[in-house]
A protein has these predicted regions:
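Short glycine-aspartate micro-motif
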Residues: 3-7, 127-131, 192
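N-terminal basic/disordered segments at the start of proteins
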Residues: 1-27
Length: 288
């Protein structure tokens, strides 16, 4: 049976059509639109322009679902709905476009992130995972494949792109998070799991630079890439443009900056990248 999942995030709006084969999700169709929804929030209000832009994408996605004759589909929204005063109006506008949207809390997003990552990182039974999104970053600590702590902070690559790229800023975000949620450090290991778009984009760039097909990254080698991008090294910028889709390039370095602060805070020397994320976790949870 085939299922459709629409993910309305801070940076992109994604549609994936899955087919479950022996409980494993196989992607039949995938498309994404770089709406940068979080950038339309001003004074805790989502601008009409952002809502309208998202509605137009949802209408297109509904047509695709109809073309594929998908009867079972659901949509969810992550960080963009959490700190706005016109949340109800925005969700109603999406409903008026023909798509009912489930609003996930930060904790729910983090938990579904971890569940989705289990499709290919279950061999790491104890440790920490993170997902740097457009408007938020999720942290999950787990022991024996069970969640100990799952939290979300309203800091992501789109929001960071509005500031100077500075490790001092992101180091402080991570330090404050670990002070507030000390359980995140109770399952610390040398290898940390990277989930979501920033982590996957980093792996693509890493693979391009180092000519590897591995699904993990050595932190010291990734740091070299980061430093070259900060220096505006033309060769490294060319590697980035070859590896990372155009819609993400503008917010990539701010996201990588956050990533480097995370591995520093957790004293990790290796990052295992998962192909699964909140979407697969949502699929497993909301489609029985």
């Amino acid at each position: 049976m085939q299922f459709g999942v629409i993910d309305i995030g801070s940076n992109t709006v994604v549609l994936i059509i899955y087919e479950l084969e022996n409980g494993f999700p196989k992607v039949i169709f995938h498309t994404s639109s770089h709406v940068h929804l979080v950038s339309y929030i001003e004074n805790h209000v989502m601008k009409e322009e952002g809502i309208e832009k998202t509605c137009n994408v949802l209408k297109e996605y509904k047509k695709i679902l109809e073309e594929y004759q998908i009867k079972e589909y659901k949509a969810f929204i992550t960080e963009p709905h959490r700190n706005i005063d016109n949340r109800k109006e925005m969700l109603q506008a999406f409903s008026n476009c023909g798509i009912e949207v489930i609003a996930l809390s930060g904790k729910e997003e983090a938990e579904l992130d971890y569940l989705g990552s289990q499709i290919d990182t279950k061999f790491i039974s104890t440790g920490t995972a993170f997902d740097i999104g457009g408007g938020s970053t999720e942290f999950i600590s787990f022991e024996n494949n069970k969640i100990i702590e799952a939290i979300s902070i309203p800091v992501g690559c789109v929001r960071l792109s509005k500031q100077e790229v500075s490790p001092l800023i992101t180091d402080q975000y991570v330090e404050d998070t670990l002070d507030t949620y000390p359980k995140l450090l109770e399952t610390k290991t040398n290898t940390i799991i990277g989930i979501g778009g920033t982590a996957r984009a980093s792996l693509k760039l890493y693979q391009n630079v180092y000519h590897t097909h591995e699904s993990y990254m050595d932190v010291s080698k990734l740091e070299y890439i980061y430093n070259k991008l900060v220096e505006k090294d033309t060769d490294m910028i060319s590697h980035m443009k070859e590896s990372i889709e155009a819609g993400r390039q503008e917010v990539y370095l701010p996201g990588l900056n956050m990533l480097m602060s995370i591995v520093k805070g957790f004293k990790a020397n290796k990052i295992q990248i998962s192909t699964g994320c909140v979407r697969e976790g949502f699929l497993f949870t909301y489609f029985n």
